């Protein structure tokens, strides 16, 4: 067995180890307080868990919602061609009436108040009918639950015969969830018991728009549809009777004056419904004397002047055409005059960009001309000409607004097209008052859901009001003539009448 011999280096290491002084730098303190932790305490884990939970419940959904809104509001890619806009338009008339045959000399009911001086020479958006906040509010589960409970309470009151209480409760429920089918059905039943059949039927139609397979709504609507159709036919007949009465009245000085006033009223209301802030008196001053209204924009002035030019074109050119066909050029020429002063670049031009109208997105620009041709083909089709003129005019207005062929001026051009159809059928021009602006857009919104009848009723109601205005003026004039024995035009009115007739014959 070999034994390792001890060396000097071993002795040196041994002595060094024995003589080394302990140093604070070399001594490891085994203080439990300063030792690194081996894990997290229970309190720390709970606090971290609560913070993570709060972040997941509040901050993450907010971030996702914000990102979704940004993506949704960003420009969208071109969509595929939409389905055809051809509608089933025989929903009010029932039996198809015969095509209206106007007199040999087509009447012109708008008297141009401007003499021979020609004017030498704005973009408005359709109001958003509902915002993203409204959509979120309508779909809020808590509010929907409250609305359904309220509807059940209203149903119990309805069955007990307390209709006033039921209606009060349902008004609250409708404010909470206006698109819920159950709420709409209950409101329809209450209105039906109030003998408000048209409103009840409208509730059922909306319920089916949001839930097409709702069996209860289908049964209820099948019950109200024939009754409402009879009411609508009666309404249209009454408007036609008024038109016939108007056409048989003798023209007089009062009628001329009423036509003149109607001209100013039409220009004022049709631009005001798009947001123009000029008053009726200011509109008249611009048209009669070319006055510049202090504090009003040039664009608002140009909107009035453009509508004046479009009405002249309709009154003196389109109404005097030998044939009743409406062409794309007629629509473009009306629009060219509507925007001729406010936006000359876009006047009379089909849009080449995508536009957005609230929650509604019209067709992509590459399909606009195709859709416009469909509208014109529908207007000139023999079967279309057998439809009641009021229905036909309302549908044509809606179709043009649906396509939205221009970047601006679509509503004004659609109302001109509506009046062109009505006036060719013997009706005086229809004024859609700015005071009914909310009803105007609401009925168009319902049409987007698939029911055009509210908009047809809206047009018929204001057509009746326009005829009543003329008849009232003429009857008042007849009473005055019996008392005074004077039925002649004043020299100024005779001069204006002659100039207008000469201008129309020249085709201006």
From Swiss-Prot:
Residue segments, region Disordered: 482-508
Species annotation: Caenorhabditis elegans
Residues under site feature: Important for autoinhibition of adenylyltransferase activity: 274
Free-text activity regulation comment from the record: The side chain of Glu-274 determines which of the two opposing activities (AMPylase or de-AMPylase) will take place. In response to endoplasmic reticulum stress, mediates de-AMPylase activity. Adenylyltransferase activity is inhibited by the inhibitory helix present at the N-terminus: Glu-274 binds ATP and competes with ATP-binding at Arg-415, thereby preventing adenylyltransferase activity. In unstressed cells, disengagement of Glu-274 promotes adenylyltransferase activity.
Chain positions recorded as ATP binding sites: 274, 357-360, 408-415, 440-441, 448
Protein's job: Protein that can both mediate the addition of adenosine 5'-monophosphate (AMP) to specific residues of target proteins (AMPylation), and the removal of the same modification from target proteins (de-AMPylation), depending on the context. The side chain of Glu-274 determines which of the two opposing activities (AMPylase or de-AMPylase) will take place. Adenylyltransferase that mediates the addition of adenosine 5'-monophosphate (AMP) to specific residues of target proteins.
Fido domain sequence ranges: 326-461
Family membership noted in the UniProt record: Belongs to the fic family.
Active site: 404
UniProt keyword terms in alphabetical order: ATP-binding, Endoplasmic reticulum, Hydrolase, Membrane, Nucleotide-binding, Nucleotidyltransferase, Nucleus, Phosphoprotein, Repeat, TPR repeat, Transferase, Transmembrane, Transmembrane helix
Protein's membrane topology: Single-pass membrane protein
Protein name from the UniProt record: Protein adenylyltransferase fic-1
Motif Inhibitory (S/T)XXXE(G/N) motif location, chain numbering: 270-275
EC number: 2.7.7.108, 3.1.4.-
Subunit structure: Forms homodimers; homodimerization might be required for adenylyltransferase activity.
Predominant location category: endoplasmic reticulum
């Amino acid at each position: 067995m070999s034994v390792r011999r001890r060396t000097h280096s071993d002795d040196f290491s041994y002595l060094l180890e024995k003589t080394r002084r302990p140093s604070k730098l070399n001594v490891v303190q085994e203080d439990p307080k300063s030792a690194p932790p081996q894990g997290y305490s229970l309190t720390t884990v709970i606090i971290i868990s609560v913070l993570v939970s709060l972040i997941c419940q509040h901050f993450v959904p907010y971030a996702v919602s914000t990102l979704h809104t940004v993506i949704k509001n960003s420009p969208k890619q071109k969509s595929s061609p939409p389905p055809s806009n051809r509608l089933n338009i025989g929903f009010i008339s029932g039996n198809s009436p015969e095509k209206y045959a106007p007199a040999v000399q087509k009447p012109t009911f708008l008297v141009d108040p401007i003499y021979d001086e020609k004017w030498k020479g704005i973009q408005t958006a359709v109001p958003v009918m509902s915002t993203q906040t409204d959509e979120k509010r309508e779909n809020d589960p808590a509010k929907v639950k409250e609305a359904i409970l309220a509807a059940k309470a209203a149903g119990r009151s309805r069955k007990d015969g307390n209709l006033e209480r039921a209606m009060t409760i349902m008004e609250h429920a409708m404010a909470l969830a206006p698109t819920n089918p159950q709420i709409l059905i209950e409101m329809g039943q209450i209105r039906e018991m109030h003998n408000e059949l048209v409103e009840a039927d409208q509730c059922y139609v909306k319920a089916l728009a949001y839930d097409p397979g709702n069996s209860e709504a289908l049964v209820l609507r099948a019950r109200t549809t024939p009754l409402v159709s009879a009411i609508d036919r009666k309404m249209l007949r009454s408007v036609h009777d008024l038109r016939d009465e108007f056409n048989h009245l003798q023209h007089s000085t009062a009628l001329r004056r009423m036509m003149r006033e109607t001209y100013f009223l039409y220009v004022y209301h049709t631009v005001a419904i798009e947001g123009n802030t000029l008053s009726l008196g200011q509109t008249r001053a611009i048209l009669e004397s070319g006055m510049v209204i202090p504090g009003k924009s040039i664009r608002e002035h140009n909107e009035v002047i453009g509508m004046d030019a479009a009405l002249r074109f309709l009154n003196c050119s389109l109404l005097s055409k030998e044939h009743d066909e409406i062409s794309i050029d007629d629509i473009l020429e009306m629009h060219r005059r509507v925007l001729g002063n406010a936006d000359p670049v876009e006047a009379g031009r089909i849009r080449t960009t995508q536009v957005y109208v609230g929650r509604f997105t019209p067709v992509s620009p590459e399909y606009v001309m195709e859709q416009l041709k469909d509208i014109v083909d529908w207007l000139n089709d023999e079967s279309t000409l057998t439809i009641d003129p009021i229905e036909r005019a309302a549908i044509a207005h809606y179709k043009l607004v649906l396509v939205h062929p221009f970047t601006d001026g679509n509503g004004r051009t659609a109302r001109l097209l509506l009046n062109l159809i009505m006036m060719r059928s013997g009706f005086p021009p229809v004024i859609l008052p700015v005071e009914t602006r909310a009803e105007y857009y609401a009925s168009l919104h319902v049409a987007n859901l698939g029911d055009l009848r509210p908009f047809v009723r809206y047009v018929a109601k204001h057509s009746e009001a326009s005829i009543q205005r003329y008849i009232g003026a003429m009857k008042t004039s007849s009473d005055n003539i019996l008392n005074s024995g004077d039925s002649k035009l004043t020299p100024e009115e005779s001069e204006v009448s002659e100039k207008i007739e000469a201008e129309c014959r020249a085709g201006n």
